[in-house]
């Protein structure tokens, strides 16, 4: 019997990290769209406890987790990973990647981030080693491609490449992204402006009840 010439393909698991302060439609709709586009077997929203690159957060750990659980009732194809929250210390992505790789040894791992985060990657702890633990997926707007060869990743625009090996590629998703930011929402909360259309009604009700 002739052996198959096809190499093994790996199921892809995505991890979208952030402070989610608060989680909003910009996060949720873009994540759901990306899960479908990349055919991810799972996409985890991974909230951090104490983000190294941000100042004090507006919502507590428990409040942010509560809002994430409310969010995935509407976006039920998404999941939550609370590993970084449970560490109760500064959140270094490299530590999470090492843990994730050890837990999901038979999967391709995608670390998902927006363009703003990618543009600060040079300041992240051990960023030059990320390629050993994951693929990097950047949620960028169509036409935006500012990648230079660094961090050890190889550029690809072929989704199937992410299934052929577990780590090492960078992929620009070119989503039709919603232009919503947590800072805009925080400003509206402080000035008591309408939040409709920016985040799920269940989260708006939660915030209003605080």
UniProtKB/Swiss-Prot annotation:
MF (Gene Ontology): ATP binding; nicotinate-nucleotide adenylyltransferase activity
Keywords recorded for this protein, A-Z: ATP-binding, NAD, Nucleotide-binding, Nucleotidyltransferase, Pyridine nucleotide biosynthesis, Transferase
Gene3D superfamilies in the record: HUPs
UniProt-listed Enzyme Commission number(s): 2.7.7.18
Source organism, top-level taxon: Bacteria
GO biological process terms on file: NAD biosynthetic process
Pfam families, per database record: CTP_transf_like (PF01467)
Pathway named in the protein's UniProt entry: Cofactor biosynthesis; NAD(+) biosynthesis; deamido-NAD(+) from nicotinate D-ribonucleotide: step 1/1
Reactions catalysed: nicotinate beta-D-ribonucleotide + ATP + H(+) = deamido-NAD(+) + diphosphate
InterPro entries documented for this protein: Cyt_trans-like (IPR004821), NadD/NMNAT (IPR005248), Rossmann-like_a/b/a_fold (IPR014729)
Enzyme class: transferase
Membrane-spanning parts: none
Reported function: Catalyzes the reversible adenylation of nicotinate mononucleotide (NaMN) to nicotinic acid adenine dinucleotide (NaAD).
Entry's family note: Belongs to the NadD family.
Listed name of the protein: Probable nicotinate-nucleotide adenylyltransferase
Organism whose genome encodes this protein: Vesicomyosocius okutanii subsp. Calyptogena okutanii (strain HA)
